[in-house]
Curated annotation (Swiss-Prot):
Its cofactor is pyridoxal 5'-phosphate. It comes from the Bacteria. Belongs to the class-II pyridoxal-phosphate-dependent aminotransferase family. BioF subfamily. This is 8-amino-7-oxononanoate synthase. It comes from Mycobacterium sp. (strain KMS).
C-alpha cells in the first residue's frame, strides 16, 4: 500500500482547528519598545532588565568579549567573565560552586539527566516546571510523580524503592500560582532516605530569602551538601541564561556529562555581563526583594485574592480558557498587560490571569492596576 499524494503535514491543520475550538490556540504578540502599558506579565521581578547598570554591564561585556561566545564552553566559549560571575553567584547563594548554561531550561535538563539515569529513581512534584518534566522523561530513570506538595507521597516513593540512587525534584516557587514548596520537610525526607534534592529557584531567587537569596536560604538549606539548586538568569536578574549551583563535585560531573552544556554554545557575554551587574544591584539594594512582595500583596487585594502572596505571582482563576483570554485582552486594551495561563500549562477548568509583581511598580502603576482589574474582573466573574 502506498500513500503517494498525502501531505505529511496535513494533520497540523486538524490539530490547529481542535485547539482553536477549545480556545487553546496561542499567538505571538509583539511588545513595543518603551510601551505605555503597565507590565504585570513579565518575569522582570526586580525591574532590572532596563536598569542603567545592567544595560551597561551588557554593553561592557560585548565590547570586551564580543557579541557571541563563539563556541561551546569546552572549546572557545569559556571566559573569565563566565567564571567570575559563577563565583559571585555561588558566593551570594551560599553554594560551593556554580555552572552557567544557555538557559534555565537547559540547566534543568543538564542537571537532572546527568545526575540520574538508568537504575535511579526520580520523584517529581505533579506541578513542576515543564523543563523538569522533560528532564525526567529524558533521564531514562524510573519516574514517580507525586501529588502537589505531598511530602508523605515523596517519603513513600523513597522508602519503597529498589534503586540505590534517588533524586527529588521540585520548584521552590510554583510558577502558575506562586505557592511555595515545603522545602524543609522535603529535605528531611530526602536525608532520611539518602536522596538528593534538586530545587529550581527560578521564581525564588531575588524574591525570597535574605536579600533575595532564594527560598533555600530562607529555610536554612543554602549550601547543603545534598541539595542542588538550579535557576534562571531571566527573571529577577533581568538577563538570560541558567545556572546550576551546588557541591563542586556536581559542577565537575556536569562539565563531563551534561549534554546541554557540552554540546551547546556558551552563554553570550552580554547576558553574563548583564546578569552579573544585576546581581551587584541586588546586593547593593536588597530592599527590592521586599518591594516585590509588598506590591504582590497590593495586586492580590485588587483582585480580591484573600491570602497575602508568598511570591511575585498572583493567580486569578477564571475557569474556562475563553473567559481568561478575553479578560487578558480587555486588560491590555485598558493599558494593563497581564499573563493568561490556559491548558496544558494549567489543569482544565483553571484557566487564569497570572499577575507578576515587580519592585519597580509605581503608585500610579498600582492605581491603574486596581482600576482596570476591578472593571475587567467584575465582568469576567458574572
Amino acid at each position: 500500500m502506498t500513500r503517494a499524494g498525502l501531505s505529511p503535514l496535513a494533520w497540523l491543520d486538524e490539530v490547529a482547528d481542535q485547539r482553536r475550538a477549545a480556545g487553546l490556540r496561542r499567538a505571538l504578540r509583539t511588545r513595543p519598545a518603551g510601551g505605555t502599558a503597565v507590565d504585570l506579565a513579565s518575569n522582570d521581578y526586580l525591574g532590572l532588565s532596563t536598569h542603567p547598570r545592567v544595560v551597561e554591564g551588557a554593553v561592557r561585556a560585548v565590547r570586551e568579549w564580543g557579541a557571541g561566545s563563539t563556541g561551546s564552553r569546552l572549546v572557545t566559549g569559556n571566559t573569565e567573565l563566565h567564571e567570575g560571575f559563577e563565583r559571585a553567584l555561588a558566593a551570594f547563594t551560599g553554594a560551593e560552586s556554580a555552572l552557567v548554561f544557555s538557559s534555565g531550561y537547559t540547566a534543568n535538563l543538564g542537571a537532572v539527566v546527568a545526575l540520574s539515569g538508568p537504575g535511579s529513581l526520580l520523584v517529581s512534584d505533579a506541578l513542576t516546571h515543564a523543563s523538569l518534566v522533560d528532564a525526567c522523561r529524558l533521564s531514562r530513570a524510573r519516574v514517580v510523580v507525586t501529588p502537589h506538595r505531598d511530602v508523605t507521597a515523596i517519603e513513600t516513593a523513597l522508602a519503597t524503592r529498589d534503586e540505590q540512587r534517588a533524586i527529588v525534584v521540585t520548584d521552590s516557587v510554583f510558577s502558575a500560582d506562586g505557592v511555595l514548596a515545603p522545602l524543609r520537610d522535603m529535605h528531611d525526607v530526602c536525608r532520611r532516605h539518602g536522596a538528593l534534592l534538586i530545587v529550581d529557584e527560578a521564581h525564588g531567587l531575588g524574591v525570597r530569602g535574605t536579600g533575595g537569596r532564594g527560598l533555600l536560604d530562607e529555610v536554612g538549606l543554602a549550601g547543603a551538601p545534598d541539595v542542588v539548586m538550579t535557576t534562571t538568569l531571566s527573571k529577577a536578574l533581568g538577563s538570560q541564561g541558567g545556572v546550576v549551583l551546588g557541591p563542586l563535585a556536581v559542577r565537575d560531573h556536569l562539565i563531563d556529562a551534561a549534554r546541554p552544556f557540552i554540546f551547546d554554545t556558551g552563554l553570550a557575554p552580554a547576558a553574563v555581563g548583564a546578569a552579573w551587574a544585576a546581581l551587584e544591584v541586588l546586593v547593593d539594594e536588597p530592599s527590592r526583594a521586599r518591594a516585590v512582595l509588598d506590591n504582590a500583596a497590593a495586586l492580590a487585594q485588587a483582585c480580591d485574592v484573600p491570602a497575602r502572596p508568598d511570591s511575585a505571582v498572583v493567580s486569578v482563576i477564571l475557569g474556562e480558557p475563553e473567559v481568561a483570554l478575553a479578560a487578558a485582552i480587555a486588560c491590555l486594551e485598558q493599558g494593563l498587560r497581564v499573563g493568561c495561563f490556559r491548558p496544558p500549562t494549567v489543569p482544565a477548568g483553571t484557566s487564569r490571569l497570572r499577575l507578576t509583581a515587580r519592585a519597580s511598580l509605581t503608585d500610579d502603576d498600582l492605581d491603574t492596576a486596581r482600576r482596570v482589574l476591578a472593571d475587567v474582573l467584575t465582568a469576567a466573574r458574572r
